[in-house]
């Protein structure tokens, strides 16, 4: 049994004579570079987005995005009468009461390892084609660099969520040989892989239409290298329950023939991204427009097109009230909303909009949220009961059943420009889903400088001045808040809270939150089905 079957527990490729999507005969594939690129490289991009639950890095429900977002102080999924109880799933996420028997967590693990396995498979066959002289050395290096980069990215997400994980790079690895590696070892592997492949990756912009649209290019690798170094204290810690982390100033990387500490490494790779021409867009919303492939800020996206791609974009349509969606032409589900603490961070401290001071409200609030009176194409929306639909951003609780705000409590996700040509359920939009962008790079650079004893004021000022906000001192606390204001709904909040040591704190309305005095919940459990499949696997601490 190979890695795909052993780790994912799914009916993946179980024999090395099977071939990827495309179903070309081996003899034909050996004579065609185009087939190799399509079936062994291009096919892997089908798995970055998704069209079913727990599949895709973003866009689908109950997967990587929800485990990294609904578990935080950023957003929540209140129970609304008969809707969104879902066997207590969302309540478990918000209160950190997940267990090793959570099927959704198991599905997320399987998805991540399915893609890793497919990458290993592609590398195996690319190697075979090289030795049959189908590929030139340049083609071989380019293809393997791209696949290794993708594999490293999926290992990044897997390590970030699950800590000590199996690190398998050989497609022929038998189950009996599969064991977990310490998180620090996986971290160094990912970092070294990205460093090794970066010179062989194209420097083209992955977010722009063209031959490298949506592909893993050099700036994507640089972004991940910066993100890894920024979290080096977390990822170098193999015992996350003892309350002790290594100091980033004493964690070193070999970069450009120099030894740099973690924070210096972050700054180095952020500068590399700048040198490739990435800049902030003049208007924040351009990054999330229907045709956001023109953004000079977006670094890596999931391509979306309601005619060409089956990737789903569930988050907005699951958030909006049914009447709101109906006015747009979508079938929406009235679910997720922002938390009260998020509203407070944006300056919303009074539920009556007529009493608010607009000067105290962050300008990004109006792009990130639907709140107060709902307008569609400038027209007020009827809530279905003869009233104007109004969202109440501060009327939020874990369970709104029976509340006057059961249907309209909480500010809802906006962020992306409304695409009125999307499919009826609002999922197949033309806005590309943004995974990595340059504003994050500036905030990473600012944070690294502060952690290294310097000033990150210039970088933080760039981000805030773009949205015409007042200057704030670039302290660590202010940078964490700025990351919420800038990156709301983008899937980074869990990662940020863990790095700042705040993930286990009691968020607003978490009345049933688990008490975690050791930090064990900063890593998710290995699910029971995975443990039973492979007796070499060991459960993470605390579960």
How should these model regions be labeled?
Residues 50, 287-291, 295-394:
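Glycine-rich, aromatic-lined ligand/substrate-binding cores of catalytic
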Residues 27, 55-78, 168-171, 201-220, ...:
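Short, surface-exposed recognition loops and adjoining beta-strand edges that mediate ligand/DNA contacts
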Residues 14-69, 94, 247, 533-543:
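Membrane-proximal, proline-rich intrinsically disordered regions
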Residues 89-90, 94, 353-436:
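Flexible, polar/acidic helix-loop-strand segments at domain edges
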Residues 34-56, 80-162, 174-210, 410-433, ...:
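Conserved, well-structured interaction surfaces
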